Every structure is written in C-alpha cells, then in structure tokens.
Amino acid sequence: MLDVVKGNLIVSCQALSDEPLHSSFIMGRMAIAAKQGGAAAIRAQGIDDINEIKEVTKLPIIGIIKRNYDDSEIYITPTMKEVDELLKTDCEMIALDATKRKRPNGENIKDLVDAIHAKGRLAMADISTLEEGIEAEKLGFDCVSTTLSGYTPYSKQSNSVDFELLEELVKTVKIPVICEGRINTPEELKKALDLGAYSAVVGGAITRPQQITKRFTDILK
C-alpha cells in the first residue's frame, strides 16, 4: 500500500452521525468520485463505511474508528476493541491516535501496534508534535501523519497546514511522513509533497460540502 500512495493523494471520506452525508452508501459514492478524480487511496471511518468503500472502489483503505471514552481524550482508534473490529475488515492500514495522552482503560499503544502487525496490516500514527513522531517510529509504526497537530492542547494551534511540523518530521524520522490536516487547496497539497511528504490526506476540502460551502459564504460576510 505504501508504494501505491507514494507521491499521490489520499482522500478522507468521512461523515459522522451528526453530519448531513452520514451514510455508508453516500460515502461509497463519494469514494468512487474521489477515485475518478485520481485518489490513490481512501481514509475511512467505521466498519460499514470501510466495507462499502472497499467493495465499490477496490482502493487501498486506511481504516479508523472514532469512539469516545469517558476516561480519555483519545478517540481515533483508541483501544484494542476498535483495532479488533478494524482487523475484521479488508482495510490495508489502520490509523490510531499516537499522541502522548493517556489511552482509555490505560491501554498500551504498543499492544495495539503489535496486534495490527500480527495480522499483516500496516499501522499509521496520528501525531501532533515532533516528539510524538519520533516515539511512533520507535514503537514500530509504518508511517506517521500530522493529523492531530492543533488538536492537542500542547501542539501548535493554527487554522492552516502545519508545514513546520512536516519539515521537522521529514528531517528526523526514517519512516514515511504523511501530511494531513487543513489542506484546503491543490497548491497546499503540492507544497506538502515538495517539502518531502511521502503522501498527503485531504478530507473536508473535497468531501464535506457543508465545509466547502461555508468557505464561499464566509467571504460574503
């Protein structure tokens, strides 16, 4: 899968339960459109969406499950329960929050990575700082993504792509670095790859019409 996405675009097709496009059928259609537009892989949330997207596109999938727990701020594939659920799908890679925050039930992130590898799948580390990226490489993750920059209280807070973190990671770790988070234009995508990103994930700017519409209406205010 890593060979397939190198230098190419990954599109995130997600619509949570409170969003207007929340539907596995709709996400499948969205993924088909992304494939027709040249996406090399899809990042998808939830078992039903993953299964539908795999069936209709046959593209490689980065699978996640977003689930909230009372005893932790981590919600992207937080525990072994979510890993086990994802391993029952045909997703080639599983992404999980690899920040330094405490996991639900005090679970150990290394156990999750080992379980993913034991089933022959790849593991992506969603991180928010350089230090977390370095630790992710030590833990055995196959790639690291800037997904959570700005979403932890101790990381850089910004409304734009964290190109600084991307550059630091590219210079520091040996595993592939994926740029993800707030990429809104083709130019930003190209800049990420020019700075050394192995690949990049674009989500809302392509697959969330309410977000796209708001960018247009905001300029009228």
From Swiss-Prot:
Entry superkingdom: Bacteria
Annotated metabolic or biological route of this protein: Amino-sugar metabolism; N-acetylneuraminate degradation; D-fructose 6-phosphate from N-acetylneuraminate: step 3/5
Keywords: Carbohydrate metabolism, Isomerase
Reaction catalyzed: an N-acyl-D-glucosamine 6-phosphate = an N-acyl-D-mannosamine 6-phosphate
Keyword Isomerase: yes
Its EC number(s): 5.1.3.9
One biological process term in Gene Ontology: carbohydrate metabolic process
InterPro entries the record matches: Aldolase_TIM, NanE, RibuloseP-bd_barrel
GO molecular function, one term: N-acylglucosamine-6-phosphate 2-epimerase activity
Pfam families from the UniProt entry: NanE
Coiled-coil stretches: none
GO cellular component: cytosol
Function: Converts N-acetylmannosamine-6-phosphate (ManNAc-6-P) to N-acetylglucosamine-6-phosphate (GlcNAc-6-P).
Similarity section: Belongs to the NanE family.
Name of the protein: Putative N-acetylmannosamine-6-phosphate 2-epimerase
Organism: Clostridium perfringens (strain SM101 / Type A)
Organism taxonomic ancestry: Bacteria, Bacillati, Bacillota, Clostridia, Eubacteriales
